[in-house]
């Protein structure tokens, strides 16, 4: 085999090894979870926020059901602003320090700092908002409709 062929083969193998290490779960969500735990000092598991109200979790619609759900809508809106700036919030990895009572975002590029700020603001909002067990795993088709959609259904 020629040396050039060996180099190409080596490059392909290295590329495949690197691709196999990529997680299919957005890594930023792991950091967001760690930030939530830092702020709430482990008092509530992160998964409690994944299916809460109309906005905590994937997507969101309608009117937030309470203050905690408004935190999630604000977080979604913040990620929307990050996307408008050309950032990919679910893939943006950032550094933060978990100082008691005052977690701080670390240095990084514009997107990393912006996304960290979104996550930090949401984590702080979660910590100060009451958690209503009745708003966990609600029927979003019934409780999270927009007013226009609800009016069309009643006509």
Curated annotation (Swiss-Prot):
The active site is at residues 75, 119. Residues 1-21 form the signal peptide. Its cofactor is Ca(2+). GO terms for biological process: arachidonate secretion; lipid catabolic process; phospholipid metabolic process. Transmembrane segments: none annotated. GO terms for cellular component: extracellular region. PROSITE patterns: PA2_ASP, PA2_HIS. Ca(2+) binds at residues 55, 57, 59, 76. Binds 1 Ca(2+) ion. PANTHER family: PHOSPHOLIPASE A2 A2-ACTITOXIN-UCS2A-LIKE (PTHR11716:SF106), PHOSPHOLIPASE A2 FAMILY MEMBER (PTHR11716). This is Basic phospholipase A2 PC1.
């Amino acid at each position: 085999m020629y040396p050039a062929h060996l180099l190409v083969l080596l490059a392909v193998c290295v590329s495949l090894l690197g691709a196999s290490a990529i997680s299919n779960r957005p890594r930023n969500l792991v950091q967001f979870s760690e930030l939530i735990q830092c702020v709430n000092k482990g008092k509530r598991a992160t998964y409690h926020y994944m299916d809460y109200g109309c906005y905590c979790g994937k997507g969101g619609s309608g009117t937030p059901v309470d203050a905690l759900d408004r935190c999630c809508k604000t977080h979604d809106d913040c990620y929307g602003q990050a996307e408008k700036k050309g950032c990919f919030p679910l893939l943006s990895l950032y550094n933060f320090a978990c100082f008691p009572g005052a977690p701080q975002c670390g240095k990084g590029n514009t997107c990393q700092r912006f996304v960290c700020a979104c996550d930090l603001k949401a984590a702080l909002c979660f910590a100060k908002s009451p958690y209503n067990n009745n708003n966990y795993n609600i029927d979003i088709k019934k409780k999270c409709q927009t007013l226009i959609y609800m009016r069309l259904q009643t006509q």
